[in-house]
Amino acid sequence: MAKVAVITAPGCEEGETLTIVDMIRRAEIPCEMVGLEAEEVAGTHHIAMRCDTVFDGSLDAYDMVVLPGGYGGSDAMRDNASLIAALQKAAAEGKWVCAMCAAPEALGRAGLLEGKRFTCYPGVKDQIENAGTWVDEAVVTDGNIITGQGPALAYAFAFALVDALGGDSQTVKNRTIYYNVFDVAGGVPSWETEAGRWPAPEGEALAPKPFHAEKVAVLMPDGCEESETVQIMDLLMRAGLTCHSFATGKDQWVHTMQGMTIKADRMFSPDAVADYDAIVVPGGRTAAAPLIASDEVMGTFRAFDEAGKLIGGLCSGTTVLEASGVLAGKRATGYTGYGAKLVSSQFVADQVAVWDANVVTSQGPCAPYPFAFKFMEALGINPQPIKDRLLYDKASGR
């Protein structure tokens, strides 16, 4: 079976990196995170990840090599002569060589884009050496080179990699509710919220901030959905919020649902999160039960609710909110079939993200973007500039 290396460099985009690994592993294709310089790597948002192995100058064991984006990570890969030589060798042997966002800079340095159609983040296209023909497309395949455009297109890019290896991307898309989030047929629905429309029509003031938050706590139990957790933190930090992750298990290094290891910022306790303005619980099939069994976690959600603080839950994280009682009588959504689990709520099956009172909920693994954007709206933050920078509308995100 084909084997994939995802090069993980200091300053990489954590959301891109983990989403790519997540989706490839869901397709049951062996995939390793390969640290460019060390086993432990901190990304652009200072989230620490522990890789499966460290690059030793050779990529011979792999059938596909993938370079995620992030300005710092892309620079490190571009300037690593040993990696450039290994990429050249892999490409010459007909192996798949893939890069997204700013990382095609490394392919340019390796001379792999000459005479090729390719894409990358629009802001770096003029910096790429030995470039072929840049095209304004989400994902481009030319021969054995696959390139992708930007952060919000990490899902589409990952599925293109799965398809190239003969994997079953359709099943993964269905299970991760990809089509609930991304209208790949084209056309981006208007973004209506309970707080108003973004951006506001000319002459109309933006909706007032119904909640105030500067600090957001994100719970990180063992078995959590890594791409959900990290992507939510990424987006909230881009909105200017201070965002810390809290390990709820016995160790600050958290073992996640798809076999990755991520370091939480802090250990959880009710006192540790008491001065935070908002709290979020992501999903993960095995992650919810220990949280529900924890009196400290349940008490924390009730305390946030009683204080009128903003609370968020995604995917199976919504069952944690249900167990704590904070969904009672509120409109909420969750993963497919969760209407039978979120029984105290007014379940909304046809909306990917819902905000009611002080609770924001969303549906599943591909929904961190609409969840985070809805969370921003609940805080009176206009998400459109962030959507623009991340090419969310290019991904036809709802």
Regions found by a protein language model. Name each.
Residues 138-139, 144:
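Amphipathic alpha-helical segments enriched in hydrophobic/aromatic residues interleaved with Lys/Arg
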Residues 118:
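Anionic-ligand binding patches
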Residues 335:
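Glycine/proline-rich loop-helix segments at beta-alpha junctions forming the active-site rim
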Residues 99-103, 313-317:
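Short, thiol/selenol-centered motifs that function as redox-active sites or metal-ligating centers
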Residues 121:
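Active-site-adjacent substrate-recognition loops and nearby beta-strands
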Residues 1-93, 105-115, 125-127, 131-136, ...:
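Extended, subdomain-level signal for the structured scaffold at the beginning of enzyme domains
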